[in-house]
Design a protein with these regions (language model features):
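Short beta-alpha junction loops
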Residues: 1, 127-128, 165-166
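Active-site HxH/HxHxD metal-binding segment of metal-dependent hydrolases
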Residues: 1-22
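Glycine-centered loop/turn motif at secondary-structure junctions
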Residues: 11, 49, 117, 156-158
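Generic structural signal for residues in well-ordered beta-strands
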Residues: 14, 31, 159-161
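Core dinuclear metal-dependent hydrolase active-site scaffold
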Residues: 17-87, 166-169
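Cap/insert and terminal regions of metallo-dependent hydrolase folds
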Residues: 63-156
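Charged, amphipathic alpha-helical linkers/stalks
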Residues: 146-148, 156-169
């Protein structure tokens, strides 16, 4: 509500999306917000010829949760998703927890690719570098985009590792 309040006070047009209710925002262009947990949401975009699902950091790590989202989206052409942990994963001594979190994240992506059958997956959320002296140890087990490519190399999907200023046709 704070974001909405800020925009309306500054005279911006604001349209708050209702969950799982498609909004037509142009000819052949619909967006749907999918609630995930308490704070997160996914964005599903449909154009005349593409279906794009941005899971960002949604917690889609079980078949049942993937099935719930699939009921809204069906198969998609492009899947955007988080590829590593981006938050605290224990103190310095908890290396095994961080390694497990990284492995689980790659397994989550594989599950998502199996369910949504995208033509391409874009690992984009998690370009994090822990730079503070007190937390830089968290970098010891993060995934990199190449880890996603290696995990999915036997699946029928193009892993599109984008860099700043890249764009999709």
């Amino acid at each position: 509500k704070r974001v909405k309040s800020f925009f309306t006070q500054n005279e911006f047009n604001f349209n708050e999306l209702k969950f799982e209710e498609p909004l037509l925002i142009g000819n052949n262009y619909k967006i749907t917000c999918i609630k995930d947990g308490f704070y997160d949401s996914a964005l599903f975009i449909q154009t005349k010829d593409k279906k794009i699902l941005n899971l960002n950091d949604c917690y889609v790590r079980t078949k049942s949760r993937a099935n719930e989202i699939y009921k809204v989206t069906g198969k998609c052409d492009i899947l955007l998703t988080q590829f590593s942990y981006a938050a605290w994963k224990g103190g310095k001594e908890n290396l095994s927890w961080r390694k497990l979190a990284s492995k689980e994240k790659l397994n989550d992506i594989a599950l998502q690719v199996k369910k949504f059958e995208p033509k391409q997956v874009i690992p984009f959320a998690s370009f994090v570098y822990f730079s503070n002296e007190s937390n830089k140890y968290l970098n010891d087990s993060v995934n990199w985009p190449k880890d996603v490519s290696n995990k999915l190399k036997h699946m029928d999907v193009f892993v599109n590792i984008m860099k700043p200023f890249d764009y999709l046709d």
